[in-house]
């Protein structure tokens, strides 16, 4: 019979998921341009690192993808969506380490657990 | 030696976490009053249920807590924060069922895995 | 010499702008599908109508545009952006009526004051 | 008979309002602490300055108010709300300059047009 209480590994993965959902839905829609990409990435990292059990957040806002998007239209900024960012999040929960990331996969920003270590 | 790949139970918990972070950071800050609480709760449920592996979302926006908050000031609406809502989320990932919830605990909106079942 | 204090008409237009920025940046990024479009539109209207001097908000989430977007990919939901919604906002500030709207124009969700009446 | 079309001054005020609503509802709810306040303020300024006709945005996240809030509880971060920030926005629309600001007034974050100049 499997236990219905979460293990520490499972709770650590739950915590990793919270950070991804928070980061994405807090900042999606933010006006962004090649010139403001760095300050946004820095703020996203520092904001989510405030959350419990969050060891490190690495956000890469791809200025080249922003430039490509803007080359086709009259505007000089767009809205942040998953297609412009890679994210890596590192959780430390009770000695369990979780690395999860977000990457564009077949046109969608997929969030996955990369590894769980004790 | 423990495996570093996530189990299905761990991935199911990760998915539950994503939904909580998404729900909270998408809707926190929304102008809300006793009269608009129901429509907001309904929209929050339907929005997050769109996400993958999300079986059901139950959002309770407490009109009594809104009324109490508003009784002390001149405004007739406030901004949505965790102190006004209870949330239950039910995940079904590859036959693993996760129930997680958000409840106010000592003044903070804590998100926890309630149970994991196969 | 022009006065530097805002007139009531100008303040009414400022209030209209606040409502548009609020609506757009609160709800952009929300997971949405043809099935959840109605509940989201209703919640957006009720939420923003809470704000001061806001007489009426009319949000039309275009289910046909959502269906067209989703026809091309593997997912059955997307994120709310301006290309899926028309918005009309009606302000009443000190007897000044402002009607403003958001419409897709050459690929961009433009927000404009339609009319100001006393 | 007053004209129902907006004047340039009125449109400039509408644009100022859009920026305030955008800034507030994009960033309200962001996890923030004294240590992350500066990076968040910088990102808010750069993000909103991307928007059309937006000359300058000045955001002051009050670290002292954050420290005071956090002194009473067990957490070392909170969520961004109006009570922690002052905002000044400067619009230049067709030669019309609008300065608007957000300040806490009797417990509420009020947004006002400070001056309109040609």
Question: Which residues make up each language-model segment?
Answer:
Chain A
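Short beta-strand/helix segments in adaptor/scaffold domains that form protein-protein interfaces
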Residues: 1-118
């Amino acid at each position: 019979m499997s236990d219905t209480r979460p293990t520490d590994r499972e709770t650590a993965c739950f915590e990793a998921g919270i950070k991804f959902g928070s980061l994405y839905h807090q900042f999606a829609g933010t006006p962004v341009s090649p010139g403001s990409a760095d300050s946004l990435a820095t703020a996203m990292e520092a904001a989510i690192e405030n959350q419990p059990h969050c060891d490190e957040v690495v956000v890469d806002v791809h200025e080249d993808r922003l430039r490509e998007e803007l080359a086709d239209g009259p505007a000089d900024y767009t809205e942040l969506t998953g297609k412009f960012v890679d994210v890596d999040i590192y959780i430390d929960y009770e000695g369990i380490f979780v690395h999860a990331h977000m990457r564009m996969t077949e046109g969608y920003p997929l969030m996955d657990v990369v590894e769980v270590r004790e």
